[in-house]
């Protein structure tokens, strides 16, 4: 009887610890929302090819609004919206930027392979116990990369780490042909002033039937410094108006991804990229949005 009571006490204690940990995780994820002055900084570091010459360092910055697009007990969707014209208004003043979804104890991933192909991967439930999968999506809500890891709350720090294969970043998508996979080492950490996306990346050339070839390594530091929400009012107004349209886009992609199979998409149709087609739509053109997404899916 005493043993049973001990097991019951241990079970209750474990459940309470898990719930407390989960609440800290959710708080950390939501701490990334708000209006931010963002600086993007990238520098190539270690060269793996003898005749390779390092490219110039990349630096850029912008105002960015991050908001909870949708939320359920085991999923939080954070939408990023860049402000490209602070004096403008509507969709001409913003870029509907990337999205990060966080799923608790998720077992289903679409892992980037190369080109415009993602492989479906099923993880054992025991391997993701207590973990959160970060699923990153492109400006058109197509998948980009996914990685799973545990939020750590220790010694006054709050951070999450994972690694993931990803397509080329937008800053090099049209200028680089010497590599086709960016292996991202992601570290996201929360501070009182905002948060940081710290990256240790490898630029990889991937070919069928051959081992991956590392071209060069890269260090990335993205600083998200919190500012007054009023500075992002343009993005907030845009999202209030257009969020139903983008919800339709997300749902259309989700329907395809829920099939739990490999995915291939075409980068453009008749030389027009999907995000450009989607940005032309008005807030109530949900049917047209759904049809557009399906047109870009190969299988």
Where does each model-flagged region fall?
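Bacterial Sec-dependent N-terminal signal peptides
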Residues: 1-23
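Amphipathic/hydrophobic helical signal segments and adjacent flexible N-terminal regions
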Residues: 3-4, 21-28, 43-57, 73-86, ...
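Tryptophan-anchored aromatic micro-motifs
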Residues: 31-44
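Hydrophobic/aromatic beta-strand elements that line small-molecule binding cavities or substrate pockets
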Residues: 55-56, 60-70, 79, 100-101, ...
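Short, His- and charge-rich active-site/binding loops that engage polyanionic ligands
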Residues: 84-104
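Short helix-loop boundary/capping segments
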Residues: 129-183, 202-207
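Internal, hydrophobic beta-strand segments that form the core of beta-sheet-rich folds
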Residues: 195-201
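Short proline/glycine-enriched turn/loop segments at secondary-structure junctions
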Residues: 208-214
């Amino acid at each position: 009887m005493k043993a049973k009571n001990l097991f019951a006490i241990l079970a209750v204690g474990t459940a309470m610890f898990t719930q407390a940990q989960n609440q800290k995780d959710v708080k950390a994820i939501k701490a990334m929302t708000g209006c931010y002055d963002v600086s993007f900084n990238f520098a190539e570091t270690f060269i793996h090819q003898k005749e390779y010459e390092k490219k110039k360092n990349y630096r850029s910055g912008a105002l960015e609004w991050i908001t909870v697009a949708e939320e359920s007990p085991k999923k939080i969707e954070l939408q990023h919206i860049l402000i490209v014209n602070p004096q403008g208004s509507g969709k001409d003043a913003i870029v509907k930027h990337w999205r990060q979804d966080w799923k608790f104890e998720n077992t289903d991933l679409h892992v980037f392979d190369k080109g415009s192909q993602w492989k479906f991967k099923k993880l054992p439930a025991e391997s993701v116990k207590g973990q959160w999968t970060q699923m990153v999506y492109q400006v058109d809500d197509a998948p980009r990369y996914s990685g799973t890891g545990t939020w750590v709350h220790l010694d006054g720090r709050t951070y999450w780490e994972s690694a993931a294969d990803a397509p080329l970043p937008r800053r090099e998508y049209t200028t680089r042909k010497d590599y086709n996979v960016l292996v991202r080492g992601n570290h996201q950490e929360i501070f009182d002033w905002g948060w940081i996306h710290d990256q240790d990346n490898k630029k990889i050339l991937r070919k069928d039937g051959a081992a991956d070839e590392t071209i060069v390594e890269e260090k990335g530091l993205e600083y998200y410094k919190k500012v007054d929400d009023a500075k992002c009012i343009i993005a907030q107004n845009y999202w209030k108006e257009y969020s139903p349209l983008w919800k339709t886009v997300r749902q259309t992609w989700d329907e395809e991804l829920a099939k739990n199979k490999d995915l291939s998409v075409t980068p453009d149709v008749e030389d027009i990229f999907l995000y450009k087609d989607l940005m032309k739509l008005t807030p109530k053109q949900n049917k047209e949005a759904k049809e557009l997404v399906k047109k870009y899916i190969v299988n």
